[in-house]
Each structure stands twice: as C-alpha cells, then as structure tokens.
Amino acid sequence: MVLFRGKYQGSSFTEMLDVEFPHLRIENRLAALGVNAAAAATAGGALSIPHGTTVLALKCEGGVVVAGDRLATEGYRVASRDLQKVYATDAHSLIAIAGAAGPCIEMAKLLRVELEHYEKIEGEPLELEGKANKLAQMIRANLPAAMQGLVVVPIFAGYDPRRRVGRLWKYDVAGGRYEETEYESTGSGSLYARESLKKSWRPGATRDEALRMAVQALMDAADEDRGTGGVDVQRGIYPTLSVCTVDGIEEIPHTTTAEIHRGIVESRRGNG
C-alpha cells in the first residue's frame, strides 16, 4: 500500500488538491493555456449551455424520495432527453441537480469523491448535516462561475442515522443552505411541482405513496413548463426515482415508474 505524505494533513479532497496539486484544478489548467473563462463568456455573449430541470425531494415513512425529470434544454432546443439528474453521493445520501448541466454533474461527482476521501482519512463517514455543509461550501466556491451563467442549485437529501429520519436541504446560488421539513423542488418547473406536492403530500406517507406523489408532481410540472420533460412512452424515458432509508439507497426501475405513471393516467381518466 502506498501512503501519500504531503503538506496537507486535513480530510478534504479539494483542499488537498489546492495545496498539493493546484495544476490539476480546471481553472488553473485553463489559465496555463491562457484561457480566461469569465472573459470569454463576456466577450462571446451568452453561452449556449445545456440546463437540466426539474428535480424534487420529499420525506416519507422511514426516509426520503428523490426524483428528477430527464430533459436538458439548450435555449429553445433539446440538449438531451435522458439526462441523469439524481446521483448517490454515498450509501445514505443523494444529490439532485438543477442548473447548468456540466458544472452540476461535475459537482455531484466531486461531492462523492469528497465524502469517500473523508471516510478513508477519518475512518468513519461524515454526518449527514456535515455533508450538506460541504455541498454548501462547494456551491459558494462556484459563485464566480454562477455570475457568468453557470448556476448550480441542487437539492441534497439522505437518511440521518442519528435522528433516524430522512432529511433534505435546498440551496441558493450563493451557497445558502436551508433545511426543509416536508418537501422541496428546484429548477424551471419547481413552482408547479411544489404546488402539486402541496396538494398531495402528507406526514407519514408510505414509500409507494411518496413515489406516486413524486411522479405526479413531475407530470404536473411538465404539463406547464417547457423546460421540464414529461414521460416519453415511445422512447421508454421515465423520471428518475430513488429512495433513501436506513437500508441504503434504492434506485427504482423504470418498469415500476411506468406502472406508477399508468396508474396516475388511468386515475385522471376516471378509470382508477
């Protein structure tokens, strides 16, 4: 086994990168090539960047459900129809991304590396609230890029083994962290998703009830917001659903999501 010995002695991966390998940071690599990303964005006008929306999270009995649509838009065009927006960051936490797709995905993956690195160094996982704080720091560090349009506004959720409940947080563009006690949605269709959840959510909802609420909220958002992708039966594209409980993270298969969708459609037609 090779042990790394350097100047940095903490447990943060990004801080270690800054101290030991600053040349590997993307902004420093661009600077070495003589590229100023902010100046390039200003000089070139608005960047054409894929954006991903809408995502949501809601508490249920014994945990939390996290969901996201699959559409990414680039202005008035479709950038991707099957973008993954919900990522596991460790065995008991999830991030749902909204904003500029590239920076969002990079931050989700970097957070996973951060948490893995912390657990290897400290010998135990970071507490759930500490994970939420770490994400807030990363979003705050992204503020200069956000001022150029590369906004990252995720939802973070997971199971807290100390409190034995599911918890979830929303964030603002400056890294402000706000815990929600029931449900939350972010992205272009978040207003409509929240309105849907306001009508359907109830304390103590079962896992299956919460999954139905999540799919229904995304369907309502897609019905009103052009940036939110609905169910694409022809292509077999359905929202991403994950459940986090004391047993870990369960990714819901698309066949189950399809059944939930059919049940909602039949119910609205008056047949269910």
Where are these regions (language model features)?
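Long, low-complexity N-terminal extensions
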Residues: 1-272
